[in-house]
Regions:
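Structural core segment of the AMP-binding/adenylate-forming
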Residues: 2, 10-12, 56-57, 84-135
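A structure-centric signal for secondary-structure junctions around beta-strands
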Residues: 19-21, 62, 128
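A short N-terminal helical cap/helix-turn-helix that marks the beginning
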Residues: 2-25
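Residue-level signal for pocket-adjacent positions within structured domains
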Residues: 19, 33, 87-91
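Conserved AMP-binding/adenylate-forming core of the ANL superfamily
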Residues: 23-72, 76-80, 97-102
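Residue-level marker of alpha-helix boundaries and capping positions
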Residues: 1-2, 41, 69, 92
Length: 135
């Protein structure tokens, strides 16, 4: 019996088997707006939407997408939406200083930079081909 074990397969299985169950509860007291409770189906929908957005930008498989986010539903969605469709996620610790984050973004080869809303002002001057505030 062949069992797929890639990231996309885990998401697809969770959506198929547990679709209506709660998959994540976002912290209500975080600095960025909370996404509340999301079912596995909703996580899958958000991940597909992110992947479609990256497709529309022309970001192909193997290209890097940097994300700086607290441990949140947004980070989980980025994990599946980026890695599940063949791109490389570059997770960056939100506790780093802006100069450290700039270094990682510039030296990672990321063409897309996803930023949590509460960090956007501090990271506004970091250059990347595509930069988006998530959430």
């Amino acid at each position: 019996m062949k069992v797929q074990l890639n990231i996309r397969d885990y998401l697809d299985r969770a959506v198929a088997v547990y679709g209506d169950r709660v998959g994540v509860i976002d912290e209500p007291d975080q600095p960025a707006p909370s996404l509340g409770s999301l079912t596995y189906s909703e996580i899958g929908d958000h991940a597909k939407a992110l992947a479609a957005g990256l497709d529309a930008l022309g970001v192909g498989p193997g290209e890097r997408v940097a994300v700086v986010s607290q441990n949140s539903a947004r980070l989980l969605i980025a994990f599946f939406g980026v890695s599940g469709w063949g791109r490389v996620l570059v997770p960056i610790n939100f506790r780093l200083h802006a100069e450290e984050i700039r270094y990682i973004v510039q030296h990672s080869g990321a063409t897309v930079f996803l930023i949590d809303p509460e960090l956007a002002v501090d990271l506004d001057d970091i250059d990347c081909q595509h930069k988006f505030v998530i959430g």
